[in-house]
């Protein structure tokens, strides 16, 4: 049964409110809606845009009690264009970088995926913002990736049953070490104190 009919694409649908609603991504932001079924079939009402993240959101995962969420967005990489240094060179097509792995397969890495935590309230419009979110990799090199490029996604992170911890895998390397390694490690992130502990030793 088709539930939505909008000009934009919807994805990452998640049941909320005990099956009475859905959370999903539309136009790079998280939206929620009430959902019900009756004689006329399924109906969606009460659309609410919950997030307002300038860089957009590609994926998200709710905590077990649905009071928080993890979402994937992007931070600027170290790769620079001429316009980053000279405003009048906006049409110049070139890049500068001081590190390896500035490309993944078919694209230059202008943005790096990071995962963020925020409180989640289904009907609180624009409540998930950059100011209300915590970067799981805060305090670490900005070019660490979470999820890992180029093919990983939100499946690299998972909530503990009590919602107090997040397990994630990450390749915390830069430069030549990053370029020559595909080895990710597993970390446990404490949501309350924002500290991560590596638990794998491979």
Map each language-model feature to its residues.
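Hydrophobic beta-strand positions that form the internal "hydrophobic ladder"
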Residues: 19-22, 69-70, 163-166
């Amino acid at each position: 049964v088709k539930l939505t009919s909008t000009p934009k694409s919807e994805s990452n649908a998640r049941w909320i409110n005990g099956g009475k609603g859905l959370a999903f991504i539309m136009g790079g932001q998280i939206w929620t809606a009430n959902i019900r079924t009756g004689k006329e079939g399924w109906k969606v009402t009460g659309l609410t845009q919950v997030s307002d993240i300038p860089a957009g959101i590609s994926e998200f995962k709710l905590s077990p009690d649905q009071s928080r969420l993890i979402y994937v967005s992007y931070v600027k990489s170290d790769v620079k264009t001429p316009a980053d240094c000279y405003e009048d060179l906006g049409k110049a097509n070139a890049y500068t970088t001081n590190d390896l792995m500035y490309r993944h397969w078919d694209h230059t890495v202008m943005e790096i995926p990071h995962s963020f935590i925020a409180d989640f309230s289904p009907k609180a419009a624009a409540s998930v913002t950059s100011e209300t979110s915590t970067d799981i990799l805060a305090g670490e090199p900005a070019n660490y990736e979470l999820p890992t490029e180029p093919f990983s996604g939100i499946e690299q992170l998972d909530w503990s049953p009590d919602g107090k911890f997040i397990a994630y895998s990450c390749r915390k390397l830069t430069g030549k070490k990053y370029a020559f390694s595909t080895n990710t490690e597993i970390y446990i992130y404490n949501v309350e104190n924002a500290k991560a502990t590596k638990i794998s030793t491979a």
